[in-house]
Amino acid sequence: MLLVLLILAASCRSALPREPTIQCGSETGPSPEWMVQHTLTPGDLRDLQVELVKTSVAAEEFSILMNISWILRADASIRLLKATKICVSGKNNMNSYSCVRCNYTEAFQSQTRPSGGKWTFSYVGFPVELSTLYLISAHNIPNANMNEDSPSLSVNFTSPGCLNHVMKYKKQCTEAGSLWDPDITACKKNEKMVEVNFTTNPLGNRYTILIQRDTTLGFSRVLENKLMRTSVAIPVTEESEGAVVQLTPYLHTCGNDCIRREGTVVLCSETSAPIPPDDNRRMLGGWLPLFLVLLVAVWVLAAGIYLTWRQGRSTKTSFPISTMLLPLIKVLVVYPSEICFHHTVCRFTDFLQNYCRSEVILEKWQKKKIAEMGPVQWLTTQKQAADKVVFLLPSDVPTLCDSACGHNEGSARENSQDLFPLAFNLFCSDFSSQTHLHKYLVVYLGGADLKGDYNALSVCPQYHLMKDATAFHTELLKATQSMSVKKRSQACHDSCSPL
């Protein structure tokens, strides 16, 4: 039996062709392929996008880099593609220019991924400076021959300043006070006075406050070297409602070049005047009936709580398990791209969350983490954190959701990254170990059976929903072996019901 499992594990590794990945490195000057005459060359890219990402380089210090992603055009010339070269030029006080070459580890055997999606890759690099215009251009290799038009794709990208939610973590910005939140409030006390409140910065000891419209209406300096809420009254020369309050800090790290913050002057809320004695008596007479009604309501509520408590004590011995709060079970769900996410995966997720108290992990909900960690690292981390891994397989019978999900370009199904083949290849080595095999479950939607490249999953426990719903729930609750989990298993078994 062990020999059969080993053969199955070995066969599942070679069942699917290896998908190309990228290996990137710096390349200065023309690519070597440019010096060679080519009969045929690959076409240009289909799409090129740029966004900012924050990466940690030391304790409380971050580097801001470009996350450049591109989509390959789905045509026959993709079989000739060897690499993609990306060049970035920046224009500011100092011009910059650098290039990277990303080689594809495998030759492309198809115009699209085996799952049906377009080939998409991304590279994180190229440090980003503040308020700089960048030109990002990319072309495929081998590129066009000399004296021929070279297909390429370019985009412009202007990096924001220190108040951007990503750029504010850049060291230059943090030293200028980008992470400081002064929480400025300003209100018009009267025609001649504005009250400004703000939280000081412990790195500074001096602040300048300007109240401006078309001209400066008021001015004040504040000296404070401790973290505290400060209030200052500033005389103004004319109407101040709607005027701009500009707060300039002078911090040790940035001196006279710190980030200025702004607020707006609004009307101060009116304070209540003392109520005359006659009005006090009148108000007391109006509130007395309401007070009596509230007193009766509180008494009724207390009596109800007492009766409920007594009834709970009398039934506690008869139904001890039903009152237990079941701990959550972490379940990683992987599914092929042909499954309709909204009609099938979401309903299956609701089934796990609502009836068996499961904490569900889906790649659809963690795209940002996948982009930061990479799909292999993300799958490995989630497998270790999960109590169970569920392979969700579709039915052979077409459902109505197919028309709703759609296969047209730009649909959610096309844009979603298919991690099912990668998860299958990554986890299938566990199928030969009885120690790890208990962690994996196969769930069919309808009457389908395993076929094709995923026959290695046949060694895992298999369930058809909703026919095997009860057995599926029981298997889920075997994540731990403690006595409390056995009690929870019975409670979940009694409370679970079909979708």
From Swiss-Prot:
Stored InterPro entries: IL-17_rcpt-like (IPR039465), IL17R_fnIII_D1 (IPR032356), IL17RA/B_FnIII-like_1_sf (IPR038683), IL17RA/B_FnIII-like_2_sf (IPR043046), SEFIR_dom (IPR013568)
Function: Receptor for the pro-inflammatory cytokines IL17B and IL17E. May play a role in controlling the growth and/or differentiation of hematopoietic cells.
Regions crossing the membrane: 287-307
Record GO terms (molecular function): cytokine receptor activity; interleukin-17 receptor activity
The organism's place on the tree of life at top rank: Eukaryota
Family matches, as Pfam families: IL17R_fnIII_D1 (PF16556), IL17R_fnIII_D2 (PF16578), SEFIR (PF08357)
Highest classification ranks of the organism: Eukaryota, Metazoa, Chordata, Craniata, Vertebrata
Subunit-level organization: Interacts with DAZAP2. Interacts with TRAF3IP2.
Key word Oxidoreductase present: no
UniProt miscellaneous comment: Evi27 is a common site of retroviral integration in Bxh2 murine myeloid leukemias, localized near the Il17rb gene. Proviral integrations result in increased expression of Il17rb on the cell surface.
UniProt source species: Mus musculus (Mouse)
Positions annotated as glycosylated: 67, 103, 156, 197
Stretches assigned to the SEFIR domain: 328-474
Keyword Glycoprotein tagged: yes
Name under which the protein is recorded: Interleukin-17 receptor B
Extracellular side: 18-286
GO CC terms, sorted: cell surface; cytoplasm; extracellular region; intracellular membrane-bounded organelle; plasma membrane
Residue ranges annotated as Cytoplasmic topological domain: 308-499
Keywords associated with the record: Cell membrane, Glycoprotein, Membrane, Receptor, Secreted, Signal, Transmembrane, Transmembrane helix
Stretch forming the signal peptide: 1-17
Organ and tissue specificity: Liver and testis. Expressed at lower level in kidney and lung. Expressed in selected T-cell, B-cell and myeloid cell lines.
GO biological process: positive regulation of inflammatory response; positive regulation of interleukin-13 production; positive regulation of interleukin-5 production
